[in-house]
């Protein structure tokens, strides 16, 4: 069987030992593959949300009323959500600086930046827990219905924000783990360890940064779709 030159090259590459991501470390390649797959999941969730919202015949709850907090007796629309967004975007900045100083092998600056990112992420999760508790216990919103309008609001809101909050929580755990590892010098010497088997390499911080920036980017879309639309 004689193959055309293009097909022959394809099969030669497929059968050889060449990696699909030439020159890209396996950890970074695997993270990119994971993020692409996660993008499809979040994309399906947001597409489902748009479909449900545009097809329902019941009035959709107004975000400026549902997510308002009262200060001095006056409700301020979306104030908590604005603070949450600011906290998460700030954490993206500290994460980027942590990657930068990590490659410079400035251990303690990297540690404090990772630790600050973890604290900001934990703060975001805490505020999300407060948001959920307010909706559930004060407003009576449930996954199967709510007293403010369309019954589907609760199910899609808790599903999408809960899935994102789970991602943030996982990221916070790993941020604390790697803060400890950086402080202990596990990335500077040849100390074998979990996710840090290659001594003298801060590549793991960059991989963690890819995940964290993805989580922040997803929140921007959630913020636009759920709170501004």
Where are the regions a protein language model picked out?
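...captures the hydrophobic TM-helix bundle architecture rather than a specific catalytic motif
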Residues: 1-229
């Amino acid at each position: 069987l004689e193959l055309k030159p293009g097909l022959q090259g394809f099969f030669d590459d497929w059968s050889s030992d060449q990696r699909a991501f030439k020159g890209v470390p396996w950890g970074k390649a695997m993270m990119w593959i994971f993020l692409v797959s996660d993008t499809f999941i979040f994309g399906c969730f947001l597409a489902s949300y748009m479909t449900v919202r545009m097809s329902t015949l019941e009035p959709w709850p107004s975000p400026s009323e549902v997510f308002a907090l009262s200060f001095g007796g006056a409700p301020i629309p979306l104030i908590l959500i604005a603070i949450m967004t600011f906290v998460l975007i700030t954490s993206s900045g500290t994460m980027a600086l942590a990657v930068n100083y990590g490659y410079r092998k400035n251990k303690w600056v990297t540690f404090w930046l990772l630790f600050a990112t973890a604290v900001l992420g934990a703060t975001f999760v805490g505020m999300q827990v407060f948001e959920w508790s307010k909706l559930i216990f004060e407003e009576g919103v449930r996954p199967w219905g709510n007293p403010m309008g369309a019954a589907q609001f609760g199910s899609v809101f808790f599903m999408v924000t809960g899935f994102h909050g789970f991602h943030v929580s996982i990221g916070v755990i790993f941020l604390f783990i790697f803060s400890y590892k950086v402080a202990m010098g596990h990335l500077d010497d040849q100390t074998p360890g979990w996710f840090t088997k290659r001594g003298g390499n801060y590549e793991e911080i960059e991989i963690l940064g890819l995940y964290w920036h993805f989580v922040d980017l997803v929140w921007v879309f959630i913020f636009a779709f759920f709170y501004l639309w």
